[in-house]
């Protein structure tokens, strides 16, 4: 039982909730390889560190000898998951979904062992259902049950539309578990309703209900919103090592511990020792460097991690301007306002962001801080602009 206790401790690490843990324990006690399912709708081409929280747990099950299925929702991706959304998602075309699916496979193999990963597409069983099968599936749940979802409840209360096909999404995801005869399904906390639907449909089909393991949603670089491309607070697993290093070093010291908990493979005792060292006066920056190097070595290699560390020292700690900054040519017209220049050069997301950064003293032109938010630049200007510690661009106005 000691070994089983250790396995459970590894599985529990970083999880938000396991439903039901007694079911999971019963399955593990049987000693056979379990069928572990993780589904992902390829709605965007890039996988970021937020996605890897669950993928890391899936990798653990591979290492424990279980059968791992990475399910690509090529069918459900065209429906659109309503989880956490305050409006109906625009549907993707089959071509978009399949193109994104190809990049998903390449990226997940940075984490999962390809030889131990079974890839499935849910169109294999959802398309053959046809109209009769879909109606039969829909008959297994009620509108009242669907309206128990917080996101649907809020949208209904605020007068936002809810499309009928959105009610189908949890049923389709749940049916995936029936088709695969899943023993365990992994998902984020925002997927709870969908994950539990799998248990209900499996019971209805006479199967043993899957255990559900929910992982927390990783906060993005801002430490507030969940990591996502739309929030511009993400680190993509395919980003260059130098870019990844700089982004990780930009997170707050408090958020660093959250990243250690959900992204690091270090023993918990070692992470606790880091905390103790900082309490005793160690510099949190050095601990953050250890985190950055660990993550970069995983998605690139150890040499890339060391190189990125050195580049970070040269660029930020010694104040050097990087050699590979983008060069941008902009039309000056009768004069280009500094806020518009920074936005057009992709150094900020909006002119209001530019004004805020200038006010904070975070904008430089050729190394000199810009204090005048109303500055206008004319044609012929050639200068290196810097926003914060990491963003540079050489701008030529014509």
Swiss-Prot record:
EC id: 6.1.1.1
Catalysis: reaction(s): tRNA(Tyr) + L-tyrosine + ATP = L-tyrosyl-tRNA(Tyr) + AMP + diphosphate + H(+)
Motif, 'HIGH' region: chain positions: 42-51
Compartment annotation: Cytoplasm
GO BP terms: tRNA aminoacylation; tyrosyl-tRNA aminoacylation
Pfam family, one: SYY_C-terminal
S4 RNA-binding domain: residues covered: 336-397
InterPro entries assigned to the protein according to its UniProt record, in alphabetical order: aa-tRNA-synth_I_CS, aa-tRNA-synth_Ic, Rossmann-like_a/b/a_fold, S4_RNA-bd_sf, SYY-like_C, Tyr-tRNA-ligase, Tyr-tRNA-ligase_bac-type, Tyr-tRNA-ligase_bac_2
Cellular component per GO, a single term: cytosol
Enzyme class: ligase
Record's keyword annotation contains Protease: no
Keywords assigned by UniProt, alphabetized: Aminoacyl-tRNA synthetase, ATP-binding, Cytoplasm, Ligase, Nucleotide-binding, Protein biosynthesis, RNA-binding
Motif ('KMSKS' region): 226-230
Phosphoprotein keyword on record: no
Annotated ATP binding sites: 229
GO molecular function, one term: ATP binding
Subunit relationships: Homodimer.
Family: Belongs to the class-I aminoacyl-tRNA synthetase family. TyrS type 2 subfamily.
Free-text function comment from the UniProt entry: Catalyzes the attachment of tyrosine to tRNA(Tyr) in a two-step reaction: tyrosine is first activated by ATP to form Tyr-AMP and then transferred to the acceptor end of tRNA(Tyr).
Listed name of the protein: Tyrosine--tRNA ligase
Lineage: Bacteria, Pseudomonadati, Pseudomonadota, Gammaproteobacteria, Alteromonadales
């Amino acid at each position: 039982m000691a070994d089983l206790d250790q396995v459970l401790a590894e599985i529990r690490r970083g999880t938000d909730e396991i439903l039901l843990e007694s079911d999971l324990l019963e399955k593990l006690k049987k000693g056979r390889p379990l069928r572990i399912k993780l589904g992902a709708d390829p709605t965007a081409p890039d996988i970021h560190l937020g996605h890897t929280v669950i993928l890391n747990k899936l990798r653990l099950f591979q290492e424990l000898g279980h059968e791992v299925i990475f399910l690509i929702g090529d069918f459900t991706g065209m429906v659109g998951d309503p989880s956490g959304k305050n409006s109906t998602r625009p549907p993707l075309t089959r071509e978009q979904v399949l193109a994104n699916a190809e990049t998903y496979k390449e990226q997940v193999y940075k984490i999962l062992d390809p030889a131990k990963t079974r890839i499935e597409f849910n169109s294999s069983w959802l398309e053959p259902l046809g109209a009769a099968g879909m109606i039969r599936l829909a008959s297994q749940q009620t509108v009242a049950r669907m309206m128990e979802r917080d996101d649907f409840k809020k949208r209904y209360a605020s007068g936002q539309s809810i499309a009928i096909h959105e009610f189908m999404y949890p049923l389709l995801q749940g049916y995936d578990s029936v088709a695969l005869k899943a023993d365990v399904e992994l998902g984020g906390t925002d997927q709870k309703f969908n994950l539990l639907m799998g248990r209900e449909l499996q019971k209805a089909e006479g199967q043993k209900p899957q255990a559900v393991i929910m992982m927390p949603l990783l906060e993005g670089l801002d430490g507030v919103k969940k990591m996502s491309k739309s929030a511009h607070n993400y680190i993509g697993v395919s980003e260059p090592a130098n870019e990844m290093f700089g982004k990780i070093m930009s997170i707050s010291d408090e958020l660093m511990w959250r990243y250690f908990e959900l992204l690091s493979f270090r023993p918990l005792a070692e992470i606790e020792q880091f905390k103790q060292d900082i309490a005793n006066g160690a510099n949190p920056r050095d601990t953050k460097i250890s985190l950055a190097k660990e993550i970069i070595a995983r998605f690139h290699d150890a040499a890339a991690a060391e190189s990125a560390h050195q580049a970070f020292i040269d660029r930020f700690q010694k104040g050097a301007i990087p050699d590979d900054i983008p060069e941008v040519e902009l039309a000056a017209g009768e004069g280009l306002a500094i806020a518009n220049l920074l936005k057009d050069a992709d150094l900020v997301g909006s002119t209001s962001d530019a004004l805020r950064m200038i006010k904070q003293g975070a904008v430089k032109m050729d190394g000199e801080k810009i204090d005048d938010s109303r500055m206008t630049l004319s044609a012929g200007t050639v200068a290196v602009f810097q926003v914060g510690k990491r963003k540079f661009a050489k701008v030529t106005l014509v």
